[in-house]
Amino acid sequence: MKHDPISKTDTVGDFIAHYLAEIGVSVMFGVISIHNMPILDAVARQGRIRFVPARGEAGAMNMADAYARVSGGLGVCLTSTGTAAGNAAGAQAEALTAGSRVLHITTQVDLGYADRDRAAIHDVPRQPEMLRGVSKSVHRMWDSNGAIGALTAAVSDALSAPSGPVSLEIPVDVQRAPAVVMAAVHAPVPTRPSAPQSAVEEMARLITQAKRPLIWLGGGARGAVEEATELMRRGVGVVTSTNGRGVVSEEEAANLGAFNMGPDAMELYGSCDLMLVVGSRLRGNETRNNKMPLPRPLLQIDADASQGGRNYPVDVFAHGDAADTLRRVLDLLPETLDTDEALAFDIARLKAQAEGRLRDTLGPYTVVAEAISGAVGAGGNAWVRDVTISNSTYGNRYVRLSDPRQGVHALGGGIGQGVAMGIGAALASHGPKAIALLGDGGTMLGLAEMITAVDEKAPLVYVLMNDQAYGVIENIQDAQYDSRRHYSKVAVPEFGAFCGSIGMPHVKVDRVDAFEAALQAALATEGPRVIEVDMCAIGPFAEAFAGPPAGAAGKKE
């Protein structure tokens, strides 16, 4: 039932709750506090938005981030001023890295004390400066007259390309102030840059001339599924970043997926005569620190003009929205390109080789990878991954995705975000259960949010890979530091006992042949479940993973 229009007796807090519901927000994540009570009291009274009380602000932000990625809409996180907003900062850095459509509504002390270092509690003298470091933009609601403008500006900025998390400060006395009466609320229309026609024409000309063209799809192409798939249908091969997975289904023969940096990818790149990069930063961890040779001419489409040629010199750059620019390129291309008929076959062959090479490194965990891939492929489950060896090996590449909204992972590389991200993804799925891959070390950071999953009856299966250590750190120490394993083996709880204490169903798997049955049983039941995989009992991977071949792990000479 819709709430009546804002009346003369309503407050700005009422208007905020009303506005969010009117533009389609149905779920909000956060932690209640003295400085955001006027908003949450209104949310509860109006009854139009489901509020998910996280156990910490970092968890709330991770939930909102994952919710945005899976739903394709706006994720909303509500925190309080000061320490609470700071608690969310690390998780918001992840949302910024991923370009997630998140609105972070935080608060401020009374307007007369804000920015003056005089408030009694929860005051941060330079809170906007802190927020700017992890936000696409920062806004403040100064009074009730400007409530509609502040909300519209913040929401529009979060949704507009290039998207990203936006912070909105609302002083508590402004929340309590009388609202301005408005007859209706109108949802903002996101803005998207339009590429110059001359760049579109030049790209179309070069693609038409190429015999073995490739398109590299990043996270900025997640809204261009139809256009990217059509380009593949006309004869262009596909490779993706980890954040661009599923833009073109990974079941397609002509899609190499995220096997983008191994010897098979290098062989493919060496045989191709054009690459079009769409919505990707070509980050160093996927391009061997930007030293991996890529096909030329190299074309780039990005909604962020500053990304043009940032990590690789390009021959043509189009500043524009991915879907719109690709559609305009397609309009200038023939229905079937005159490309090498063997290109799709070569990609399928090289992908099969890459998958086989990966399976050889997994040892007993091939069974786990196959079971999860089969479940995700058949059910279309959201596939959420924390930073763990299992994700760095098979999670990021081997488990095939057919839709970009299926994939959620910690793009910025910070551990411990998977527990909360699983909840946000699960509540956005509206279908099959989400599956979240965790490690025991990272789980320690987000453990409190497991009871949130129970409380919310989240449709979610946690697969907890427990090797009783920071496994990848130990492997790096073995490879780079003569096996000096300092500080990497930390105590973890008995997860079965912990789960029992919060009412979370739990099963421990100590034989890989029991994993698939445990997974299917967990997927068939309601609510959250934990499958703990005892890696100490099962044994090691066939080949130790000691970090990516580029990046901070370095290489011992």
Across the structure, where does each feature detected by a protein language model lie?
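Generic recognition of flexible, low-complexity loop/linker segments
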Residues: 155, 201-204, 226-227, 263-265, ...
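Active-site diphosphate/adenylate-binding microenvironment
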Residues: 13-23, 31-34, 39-46, 347-419, ...
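Basic phosphate/pyrophosphate-binding loop/patch that engages nucleotide-derived ligands
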Residues: 160, 377-378, 454-459
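Phosphate/pyrophosphate-binding active-site segments
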Residues: 1-8, 145, 181-183, 205, ...
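N-terminal alpha/beta PP-like core and its mobile active-site loop of ThDP/TPP-dependent enzymes
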Residues: 2-336, 459-462, 494
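A structural motif corresponding to the C-terminal end of an alpha-helix
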Residues: 134, 371-379, 499-504
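Thiamine diphosphate
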Residues: 113-122, 269, 309-311, 317-319, ...
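Short, small-residue-rich loop/turn micro-motifs
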Residues: 32, 106, 172, 242, ...
